[in-house]
Amino acid sequence: MFDIQYKQDIGIGQLKLGMTSDELENALLQMKKQWSNSSDEAMQMECCAETDDPNLITGRYMDNDLFFLVQYRNGKATEIVIQRDLSKVASIKLFGMDMFNTTAECIIDSLMKKDNVICNEKDLQLGTEYIFPEIGVRLWRERAFHPKLLKDPLYMEEMQAVLEDEYQYQYFQMITIIG
């Protein structure tokens, strides 16, 4: 299990904001050794500039099971992104909540008691991106799904063929730790 730390020492497990790429890569390899379900495959690591800003570098760390994305500014990690697949080998918790196995609605309601939320939709239950600036976390899902949509006949008609797949969008797919 890895807890998301906030305020002092913001990070996920041993991965901390403010680390250099070398420090973060070493910490990631140490964490990977702890995951009994993780493959023995070597982790691919690459860093590249994706914008015109020479001080902003994106690091990608991946193997068959896992994917991490890290933004570095001036050589220090400023964002750490983890995907849902990590929950196959580690439990990711914030304030005691399992961030990938608790519904988005429960997570949002709980975090709103601790911080203001910035959401890309007026209806908080149907947003895809949520930012909690004081806590230092951004939550994302590809599409929004809430059981209230099942009461909408037009939604039911349009989504009938893929309705079972839609249930996965009750959960977040990516969590970003931001400084």
Language model regions located:
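Hydrophobic/aromatic-rich structural module bridging two neighboring secondary-structure elements via a short loop
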Residues: 50-73
